[in-house]
Design a protein with these regions (language model features):
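A short alpha-helical cap/connector motif
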Residues: 1-124, 128-193
Length: 193
């Protein structure tokens, strides 16, 4: 699977509107990331999360250039729906749609107004990092009743205390914390069996 992915992405060039990672022919994952974006340590985190959760369907809140979307698609066989309020990532969306035609879908929308009847096993939250934004994304996510949530930037100095308060507020169970990049946290939805 990674060999196929390597062939697809080895020629991608970095610019502001397309995936900013290169996967060389030797299948080693190599990332060229602007400061503040997900890097190769995050790839290992997402790989671990996929091994723990074995998701069939993932919702991603916050797409940006599509780096994390690609990581979810490489590390799982799940379908992935990505949401973002902005439209600056058109080339990345087109590339992922063409290479993962039955697994990837992108919706440009505000997560606060997102509604779906689809069931998601895992929801990855990396959108609005304000207290109200994270709280709203978790509240919306819990209405979709996923098995797991993942919060990005969990250990970021500006967000950690807020995220911890929100996790406590919704009585969510922390499964694992990842101290890579700005950190991620894997959370179990205790209400879904």
């Amino acid at each position: 699977f990674r060999n196929h992915t390597t062939e697809i992405y080895q020629s991608i060039q970095h610019d502001n509107n397309i995936l900013s990672m290169d996967i060389p022919a030797d299948t080693e994952i190599d990332f060229e990331m602007p400061e503040g974006e997900m890097n190769h340590h995050c790839f290992e985190t997402i790989e671990d999360i996929c091994q723990i959760t074995t998701p069939n369907s993932i919702l991603e809140i916050g797409f940006r250039r599509g780096n994390s979307a690609l990581m979810w698609l490489i590390n799982s066989s799940a379908t992935l729906m990505s949401l973002d309020i902005d439209d600056f990532s058109v080339k990345s969306v087109q590339l992922l749609e063409s290479q993962f035609p039955n697994r990837f879908q992108y919706l440009q929308c505000d997560s606060r107004t997102f509604k779906s009847k689809k069931i998601f096993d895992l929801i990855f939250i990396d959108g609005d990092h304000s207290f109200e934004g994270v709280e709203g994304d978790i509240k919306m996510s819990l209405q979709l009743n996923p098995k797991y949530l993942v919060l990005d930037d969990y250990f970021h100095g500006d967000h950690h205390q807020d995220m911890y308060k929100i996790i406590s507020q919704f009585d969510l169970e922390i499964i694992k914390e990842y101290r890579t990049h700005q950190g991620q946290v894997l959370i179990k939805n205790k209400l879904r069996k």
